[in-house]
Design a protein with these regions (language model features):
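Active-site Tyr-X1-5-Lys
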Residues: 183-211
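Glycine/proline-rich active-site loop of Rossmann-fold NAD(P)-dependent oxidoreductases
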Residues: 204, 216-234, 264, 272-284, ...
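NAD(P)H-binding glycine-rich loop region in Rossmannoid oxidoreductase-like domains
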Residues: 85-88, 93-142
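Conserved Rossmann-fold NAD(P)-dependent oxidoreductase catalytic core, especially the SDR/UDP-sugar
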Residues: 118-120, 131-189, 209
Length: 397
């Protein structure tokens, strides 16, 4: 660690963390660097290769499922997104496609004749909840139908939903939420997407599954709707200004029970659901498997930045942090950080939205455990490991 980058108290300076182009950070895995040696690949002749399409491959979910499948070695991967990736990735074929344009989808996807699995991680944001429905359903249909028509070997479609299905974004809801709980008062585009699958799958040769994570913890440059990068940049700027690390949202949020889903854990769950008969045509909650309160983890986060933990001071991050781009640029120069544009790292309205909920967020994991998925991670370790990775990747001082 270079002297002018400040003090980092969580991760040893000798640790080696792969950057985004060479493998993505994943909480607990970051604490097991010695175990992250490349797997010995078996001869291709001894395996049956599966071919996956990842819709939304450049997002915080898509990047991790892509990495996971490629590391397994018996998957070929085709990634879909609207924009060309800023980096090339070995063994990943990319297709740029506008899934809101059916003609473009047909033209780009009708040649994908060997696809066995589709992992759907795409999302189109709109100003109101009602406006989310049409574009997000259209993108799903425009991805599934051309590929299903082209590939006679399509086996499974995996969909990512979330706890907003239960109304976690609206206010207090029944906790712990179970998959059998009804959705909140519509509209909800998760409901529309799932109902389309339930309606159309019985006449198809493929199966489907849907997972409901919460507060996905990962990193994807150019996808600023990520609480971990917002937290990291907020803490780094607070330290640069000589401030304690105050919790910037409601007192109730500080004390409410919360949960997260590590992106690497989610990738494992997606692969399990796509290849396990017990998961076919089923919906599962998938979180880290534990719960926490921000009040309890906040001192550990402050220590990681060598800062004093401050009290709650409720502010709108959108109002107080948007003007910090010049300061961040100066910090990048001062500490030799990667020159990622401020607006590509953080979306303060998203952080305000996530931290606005001063009610418990809890999902029941019984169903997925009974079906055979038993992976779990420690959420506090995930948070601290992700922040350490940002430091070693020179994203923050």
């Amino acid at each position: 660690m270079t002297e002018n980058r400040g003090t980092w108290c969580f991760w040893p300076a000798t640790a080696t963390i792969a950057g985004p182009s060479g493998g993505l950070p994943s909480g607990v895995a970051l604490r097991q660097c010695a175990g992250n040696l490349p797997r010995k690949f078996e001869p291709q002749a001894h395996r049956t290769m599966k071919q996956a399409v990842i819709v939304g491959v450049q997002g915080v979910i898509g990047r991790y499922i892509c990495d996971h499948l490629l590391k397994l070695g018996d998957w070929e991967v085709i990634g879909l997104s609207r924009r060309q990736p800023a980096e090339t990735r070995p063994r990943l074929r990319h297709v740029s496609v506008d899934l809101l344009d059916r003609a473009d989808a047909e033209a780009k996807l009708s040649g994908l004749t060997g696809i066995t699995h589709i992992f759907y991680c795409a999302f189109q944001s709109r100003p109101t909840w009602a406006e989310h429905n049409a574009p997000n359903l259209a993108m799903l249909v425009n991805a599934v139908e051309p590929i299903a028509n082209a590939s006679m070997v399509l086996e499974h479609f995996n969909l990512i939903e979330g706890t907003k299905y239960y109304g976690s974004h609206l206010g207090p809801f029944k906790t712990p939420a179970k998959e059998s709980d009804p959705p909140h008062m519509l509209p909800n585009f998760y409901y529309d997407q799932e109902q389309w699958l339930r309606t159309n799958q019985p006449a198809s040769r493929w199966t489907w599954s849907a997972l409901r994570p919460h507060a996905i913890c990962g990193f994807a440059l150019g996808n600023p709707m990520n609480l971990m990068t917002c937290l990291a940049v907020y803490a780094a700027i607070s330290k640069e200004l000589g401030l304690p690390l105050r919790f910037p949202c409601k007192p109730g949020t500080f004390d409410a029970i919360y949960q997260m889903t590590d992106s690497a854990l989610l990738a494992k769950g997606m692969t399990w659901a796509a290849t396990t008969p017990a998961a076919y045509n089923q919906v599962f909650n998938l979180t880290n498997g534990d719960f926490f309160r921000w009040r309890n983890v906040w001192p550990r986060i402050a220590r990681a930045f060598d800062m004093e933990p401050g009290p709650v001071q409720t502010i709108k991050l959108t109002e107080f942090m948007t003007d910090k781009a010049p300061l961040w640029s100066a910090m990048q120069q001062k500490y030799g950080l990667e020159a990622h544009p401020y607006e590509q790292l953080v979306a303060w309205p998203f952080a305000d939205y996530v931290w606005a909920g001063d009610w418990d967020i809890m999902s029941d994991m019984t169903k997925i455990r009974r079906a055979g998925f038993h992976e779990y991670v420690d959420s506090e370790d995930i948070i601290l490991g992700m922040l350490a990775a940002f430091h070693h990747q020179r994203i923050i001082p």
